[in-house]
C-alpha cells in the first residue's frame, strides 16, 4: 500500500525515528508505523506498528524523543467509525512499547484530530490538537502527561479569540518544559493568520494569544514551531499570495 505523512524526531545520539501512516498496514485500513535509524541513515531493525487498536483508521502521527532516546507518538484514531479522537503511546529507545495506546482527549463528541506532541528530557510530554465540537467553533486544546503516559492536567483551552475556526496546531518545548503553541486561525474580519501562545510546563498560560505573521494579505496556513533550550522559538508557515502567486 501507499505510505503517507511522515514525521521525524532526532535522538540524542544523532540517530532519528520516523513515523508515518501506512495504507493497508492493519489489513484494510490506515495504520501508524515507525522505524529507527542511525546517524548515518541506516535502518535499525524492521518497521513496527505503533497502534494496537486496528479497527478503522489510524492516521496523521506526530513524534517526540526524550533525553534517553525514548519516544512518544500521538496520532488521529478512529475509535468509532467516522468519530475521530487523539491517541498516544510511549516507546523505549529500542522501540519496545512501554504501554498500550491510550486516548488523549477527554471530550469525545465531534472530531479531535491534527495532533502534535512535544517531549521533555525526562520523558514527560504534551499533546495539542484541534477540537471540532467541544465549543461553538473549532478550537485548540492541550494536555500534559508524565513519562508513563498518565495525565497531569485536564484538557486546557489554548486559543482565546472567537471566530470561524482554529486548526493545525504545532507545539514545541524549551529545556524547562515551557511551551509554545502555534496554530492557524480564521477570525471574524480576518483571512487566515498564524497565532501563538506561551505556557509553562504545567500548561498555565504565560501570555495571551498573539499574531505571528506581519503580512496579512492573502492567507497564512499550516504553521510549525521549534524552540531552543533557552526559550527562543521559530515559527514557519505557508503564505498564499505573499510572493505574488502561491506559497
Label each residue range with its predicted role.
Residues 1-247:
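Extracellular, repeat-based ectodomains that mediate carbohydrate processing or recognition
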